[in-house]
């Protein structure tokens, strides 16, 4: 298969999966096989006339919209039944060398919406992009799923290349790094693997937490990190947790990740969520009333990915039902999502209440200055759960427990994390409290 088309289609699938019900996605979208691409048209293979009719009538808008977001181009879509229709010729074969960076064109600094939760991370990313290996090296970005870490990493890559196209920039997930290493070992191509990763100017590696516990991957990345750092090359890393909280990560890697600058990204506040939706509508020329965007932003507070997915669902619902977009229609379009999101709200308050109830304390005890073990131990568990079950930053967690310093929170999380590995009783306690919180 054409590698360029394969890359575009895989990214399109990821986008569509977040915008459709699981049944619809599995029934209709997963039956599609990308066939060919030229300057104007993408040909998609489908198994039968029935599938073709449904896709053309119900899902062509969604697919075209997703393709436009991924490729920044308006492709025509042609649904073909391979056994009946000749395959369109491929215009140009894609090679790794022609696009080594693997950067998503829609993730730039221009499309990034700055808010209170990401202002520091954005400033740090821009500083690194303006002066690779001279400002902060490595730059370590961390935060929950869908908060913009990957967007900032791609934005750095785009900016660097816009200033100096001759530089070698590579974005890769830790999973891809691991898989390529496995293949290199299997095929006896270790030297080719090392040459690829140690001869670039800017390495952007996403979701580094997944290499924890993979000894061979950690070993290889350790030497890759050293080679790049000693050659004065820029390294940008992302994770869902700060280095100290990544379980099973080797200490030598953890210490290196802390050499440069660590910046966290918190969930966006209401104003930022509204701004994100306005930006998306502007970029894609969508006509969405302001009160609808305010409604969506108020109801979907989890992360940016779900926020944009909710807007896409409203747009698709309007198109398919031929209804004007308004708040009532948005309520109908998002009813499944809103029902699920209302079920459980997990924040510091619900966690403190659950822990206090379990240990027969008052929530004020957890926020107090008392240091006796009957209070300090439950407090440490509550801090650990805040870190594990929410996207709160360390300083914010400290504030919620009587204004304690973030280092106290780090100590509590590390202690509970270590004790969980050695105590079956503590593991049962924590799991029971979690069930009480989630209603599981």
Curated annotation (Swiss-Prot):
- The protein's name is Chromosomal replication initiator protein DnaA
> What highest taxon heads this organism's lineage?
Bacteria
- What gene does this protein come from? dnaA
Ordered alphabetically, the record's keywords are: ATP-binding, Cytoplasm, DNA replication, DNA-binding, Lipid-binding, Nucleotide-binding
**Protein task:** Plays an essential role in the initiation and regulation of chromosomal replication. ATP-DnaA binds to the origin of replication (oriC) to initiate formation of the DNA replication initiation complex once per cell cycle. Binds the DnaA box (a 9 base pair repeat at the origin) and separates the double-stranded (ds)DNA. Forms a right-handed helical filament on oriC DNA; dsDNA binds to the exterior of the filament while single-stranded (ss)DNA is stabiized in the filament's interior.
The residues that the entry says bind ATP are 146, 148-150
Q: Where is this region: Domain III, AAA+ region?
A: 102-318
Could you tell me which residues belong to the region Domain II?
Answer: 94-101
Q: Which SMART domains match?
A: AAA, Bac_DnaA_C
């Amino acid at each position: 298969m054409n590698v360029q088309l394969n890359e575009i289609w895989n990214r399109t699938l990821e986008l569509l999966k977040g915008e459709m019900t699981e049944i619809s996605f599995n029934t209709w979208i997963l039956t599609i096989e990308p066939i060919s691409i030229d300057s104007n048209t993408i040909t998609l293979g489908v198994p039968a006339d029935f599938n073709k009719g449904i896709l053309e009538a119900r899902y062509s808008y969604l697919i075209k919209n997703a393709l436009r977001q991924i490729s920044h181009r308006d492709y025509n879509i042609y649904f073909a039944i391979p056994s009946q229709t000749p395959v369109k010729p491929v215009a140009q074969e894609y090679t790794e060398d022609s696009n080594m960076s693997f950067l998503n064109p829609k993730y730039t600094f221009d499309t990034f919406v700055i808010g209170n939760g990401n202002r520091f991370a954005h400033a740090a990313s821009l500083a690194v992009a303006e002066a690779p290996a001279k400002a902060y090296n490595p730059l370590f970005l961390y935060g929950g799923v869908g908060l913009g870490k990957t967007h900032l990493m791609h934005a750095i890559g785009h900016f660097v290349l816009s200033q100096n196209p001759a530089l070698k920039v590579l974005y890769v997930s830790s999973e891809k790094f691991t898989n390529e290493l496995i293949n290199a070992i299997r095929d006896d191509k270790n030297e080719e693997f090392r040459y690829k990763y140690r001869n670039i100017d800017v390495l952007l590696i996403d979701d580094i937490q997944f290499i924890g516990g993979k000894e061979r991957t950690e070993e290889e990345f350790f030497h890759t990190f050293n080679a790049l750092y000693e050659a004065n090359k820029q390294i940008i890393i992302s994770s869902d947790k700060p280095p100290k909280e990544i379980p099973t990560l080797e200490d030598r890697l953890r210490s290196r990740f802390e050499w440069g600058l660590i910046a966290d990204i918190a969930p966006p506040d209401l104003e930022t969520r509204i701004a994100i939706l306005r930006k998306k509508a502007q970029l894609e020329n969508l006509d969405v009333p302001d009160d609808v965007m305010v409604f969506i932003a108020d109801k979907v507070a989890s992360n940016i990915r779900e926020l944009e997915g909710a807007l896409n669902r409203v747009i698709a619902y309007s198109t398919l039902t031929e209804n004007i977009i308004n708040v009532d229609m948005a309520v109908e379009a998002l009813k499944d999502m809103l029902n699920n999101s209302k079920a459980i709200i997990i924040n510091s308050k619900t966690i403190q209440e659950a822990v206090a109830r379990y240990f027969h304390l008052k929530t004020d005890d957890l926020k107090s200055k008392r240091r006796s073990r009957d209070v300090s131990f439950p407090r440490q568990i509550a801090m650990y759960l805040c870190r594990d079950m929410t996207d709160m930053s360390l300083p914010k967690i400290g504030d919620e427990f009587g204004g304690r310093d973030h280092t106290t929170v780090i100590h509590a999380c590390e202690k509970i994390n270590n004790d969980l590995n050695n105590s079956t009783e503590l593991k049962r306690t924590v799991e029971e409290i979690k069930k009480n919180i989630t209603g599981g």
